Amino acid sequence: MGYRILTLNQISVRGLERFPRDRYEVASSLAHPDAILLRSADLHSVEIAPSVLAVGRAGAGTNNVPVAALSKRGVPVFNAPGANSNAVKELVIASLFLAARNICQAWDFARGLSGDDKTIDEATEKGKKSFAGFELPGRTLGVIGLGAIGVEVANAAERLGMRVIGYDPDITVQRAWQLSASIEQARSLDELFSRSQFVTVHIPLVEGTRGLVNSTRLQLMPE
């Protein structure tokens, strides 16, 4: 008899192909599953069947999984740290460009133009300076959490010419070796916020990190 795997989210076909059908039954609706595979579904709010022997999350964080409760039951929780690090890095860098160069506002402005070519040209010349923004080289990015994602973000921003400050009191030796030597270390969160024009956070949302970014710390950031 094969193992029964309950999927609670859409999982990549390439990932599911790793479970041969002659040994595994994989479905989004199963009674008495041996394992649960999920992405963003919140396991805190559902009853986990006594038959479950393992839980796997297709992602890095496990804040949507009751790890402590499952550990007491002897149920291991597996995750995939770093699996989405490049995708997240690209989105963070894209967000920096969006914020610095007023791209969304310029897009809305351009879509709102109407009239003949002469009218549009005149409106463009008159309005385009409002969206110039500023360039990223020389600006400071604070990175909170230097795991797989944080390190990639920090290194990418540094290659863009940004000054990068990192904060992670629990950084591993492996991640430290991967980090560019030019990345500066912040001794505290308050120091990081007070020196950064942009801040990006790459740590799990748990009770110990909830409220880490707050109005008091945001007010420390330079104008």
Which sequence ranges carry the predicted segments?
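Rossmann-like adenosine-cofactor binding region
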Residues: 44-46, 169-223
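Conserved S-adenosyl-L-methionine
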Residues: 159-163
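Glycine-rich Rossmann-fold phosphate-binding loop(s) that bind the pyrophosphate
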Residues: 146-147
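Phosphate-binding beta-alpha-beta segment of Rossmann-like dinucleotide-binding domains, i.e.
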Residues: 81-140
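Gly/Ala-rich phosphate-binding loop of Rossmann-like dinucleotide-binding domains
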Residues: 154, 158
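Structural/interface elements that position substrates and couple domains in central-metabolism enzymes
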Residues: 3-6, 10-14, 21-26, 85-87, ...
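An N-terminal-biased, well-structured beta-alpha scaffold segment characteristic
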Residues: 1-80, 194, 214
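N-terminal Rossmann-fold NAD(P) dinucleotide-binding loop
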Residues: 150-151
